Every structure is written in structure tokens, then in C-alpha cells.
């Protein structure tokens, strides 16, 4: 957590966490102050990445998803704030930074302005319980159509990582997925076999993943941990024998 605890004096005076958070980062009543606060927060994130040697940062972009907590979605609703946040991050992490630190967006990349697409290494899509290549191609098309004025279909496809929900489906590797050959396999493996197709052309994807990958640990013998993820890796990038 980047925001420090509420000072005792403030807490005694009745300051709420929401009030303190805005006060600490400088989020005031003006648009300029809010943009500055977002930039300050972005730099604090990058400072932590540098300090602890992290690989990068994942923005959960979910403005249209239901959330289990209260949120005012101010990064999304305040004009210019989200672009300022992303652009500040991208100076120190991501493909524009030259640092080999990753900047990825998870959830709804298409909720961001199309001008920000090339600021990210990957677009992570929560393609949970998809059952066919057709559904995955529909997910792909949403992103390609959104970014089409700034990025080619190939550039978008290369950033796409599709994920299954292992919080619910780790034991079976996902839900039943029907391949283009008509066979039924676990959806994570279907995602691994999937070749992104748009407007009749096939492209390379960024990869696949799983939400709560740790739930798969111990699903098989002690000699083979993470069996479904390992199989997915082998499908996409077979070991040299």
C-alpha cells in the first residue's frame, strides 16, 4: 500500500480514509491538481518497482465490471487523469521506457483511449469460460476495432494474453472447449492452441494465462506442479528434444 496510515491527529479529528488519501496525494478540486496527483501516484508506483526489483506493473482496467468494493472510478471519470497516469508510468516502465520493465493492462484495454495502446507490453483479457476459437476471436476483434486507428491488427494480436479463471476451474484446466478440429479439451489448452484470426487473417498472440494460477499448485503429483499451465506452455513453445 503506497498511501501511509492516517496520522493520529487527523484520525482524531474525524478524517476518513478517503479524505486522507486525497489529501496525501494532492487530489484537490481542480482538474490540474487531480492530474498532478495521478502523476505523483504513478511515480510512487515506479519508485516501488525500482526499490524492490519488480518486473513491472499491471493496471486493472475494469471501469465497466462490477466490483466487490466501493469505488468512485475517479481515474476514469476525471478528464485527462487516466492518460496522465499511463503516460507517467510509461516513462519508467513499459515498451516506451527502454527499461525492460513491463507495463500491462488487464480487463478492458478498450476502455483506455486508443492513443495509449502502444504504451503497454500486453493486453490481458479475462476470457473466462470461453468454449471455442470463435469466442476468442470475438474478444480479439473488440480490441482490434478499438485500437485500429493507432495500431495494426498484428500489433494488437501480439499483445493479447487470454486467461482462464483458475479460482473456479484449476482442477480441470478450465471448462470444455471445442477446438477447430472438433475435439473437446480444457479451455486453457484451447486458448494455447488458438491462433488469433481477424478479417480472414491469422496472427500470433501474446500468450495465455490463468487467474489465481496458485490454485493449480498441488493439483497433481508432487513431481508435476502446475500441470495445465505446463501443458499450455508446451503447446505454444514445445521443449527441444
Predicted regions and their residues:
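Aromatic-rich peripheral "rim/lid" segments of glycoside hydrolase catalytic domains that contact
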Residues: 214-241
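Glycine-rich phosphate-binding active-site loops on the catalytic face of alpha/beta enzymes
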Residues: 208-213
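Chitinase-like catalytic core of GlcNAc-active glycosidases
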Residues: 1-164, 168-186, 190, 202-205, ...
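Solenoid-like repeat scaffolds
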Residues: 194-199
Amino acid at each position: 500500500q503506497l498511501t501511509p496510515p492516517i496520522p493520529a491527529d487527523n484520525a482524531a479529528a474525524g478524517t476518513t480514509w478517503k479524505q486522507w488519501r486525497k489529501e496525501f496525494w494532492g487530489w484537490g478540486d481542480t482538474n490540474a491538481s487531480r492530474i498532478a496527483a495521478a502523476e505523483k501516484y504513478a511515480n510512487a508506483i515506479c519508485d516501488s518497482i525500482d526499490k524492490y526489483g519488480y518486473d513491472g506493473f499491471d493496471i486493472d482496467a475494469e471501469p465497466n465490471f462490477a466490483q466487490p468494493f466501493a469505488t468512485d472510478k475517479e481515474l476514469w471519470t476525471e478528464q485527462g487523469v487516466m492518460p496522465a497516469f499511463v503516460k507517467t508510468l510509461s516513462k519508467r516502465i513499459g515498451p516506451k521506457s527502454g527499461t525492460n520493465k513491463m507495463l500491462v493492462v488487464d480487463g478492458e484495454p478498450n476502455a483506455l483511449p486508443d492513443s495509449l495502446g502502444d504504451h503497454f507490453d500486453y493486453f490481458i483479457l479475462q476470457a473466462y469460460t470461453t468454449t471455442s476459437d470463435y469466442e476468442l476471436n470475438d474478444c480479439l476483434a473488440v480490441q482490434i476495432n478499438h485500437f485500429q486507428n493507432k495500431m495494426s491488427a498484428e500489433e494488437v494480436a501480439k499483445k493479447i494474453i487470454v486467461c482462464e479463471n483458475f479460482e473456479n476451474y484449476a482442477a480441470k484446466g478450465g471448462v470444455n472447449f471445442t477446438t477447430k478440429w472438433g475435439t473437446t479439451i480444457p479451455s486453457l489448452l484451447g486458448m494455447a492452441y488458438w491462433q488469433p484470426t481477424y478479417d480472414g487473417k491469422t496472427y500470433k498472440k501474446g500468450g495465455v494465462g490463468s487467474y489465481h494460477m496458485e490454485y493449480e499448485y498441488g493439483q497433481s503429483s508432487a513431481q508435476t506442479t502446475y500441470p495445465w499451465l505446463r501443458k499450455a506452455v508446451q503447446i505454444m513453445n514445445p521443449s527441444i528434444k
